[in-house]
Amino acid sequence: MTYWLCITTQENWEIIKEKNVWGVPERHKNAISRVKPGDLLLIYVKQRGVGKEIEGPKVVAVYEAVSEVFRDSSRIFKSPPEMGNEAFPLRVRLRPVKIFEEPVDFKKLIPDLKFIENKRKWTGHLMGKAMREIPEEDFKLITSSSK
């Protein structure tokens, strides 16, 4: 079993919840092609501005992959402006394992996460990625911090 951190926006998190599917752009084919049924995916929602407030990055749920990767170009996901008209066509069907009552504050965990080697420039470990594999101990740390 492999553990994944899937990086998305608040808008696309709502779609993941509704449709039980994860999708990435074509350029992330190498990462998603390694996802297998039974793998566990943590959904990480990026930081965003809400009015004058900043809502920090958070982990909101655990899902299990229940399909192989498949291609579907239907436009269910919202493409951020910087990505143009992206359809996120490479997809995996999901089964919810746990949707956290309260999202996990990702920044608080950075000092203890093994996959983040540079704690001061931690965003570099996520920037430009749709998903990344994480060690089991990081998966357990994140999920044990949830409610």
From Swiss-Prot:
Family of the protein in this entry: Belongs to the UPF0310 family.
Organism encoding this protein: Korarchaeum cryptofilum (strain OPF8)
Pfam families hit by this protein: EVE
Regions crossing the membrane: none
Entries under InterPro entries matching the protein: EVE_domain (IPR002740), PUA-like_sf (IPR015947), UPF0310 (IPR022996)
Name assigned to this protein: UPF0310 protein Kcr_0474
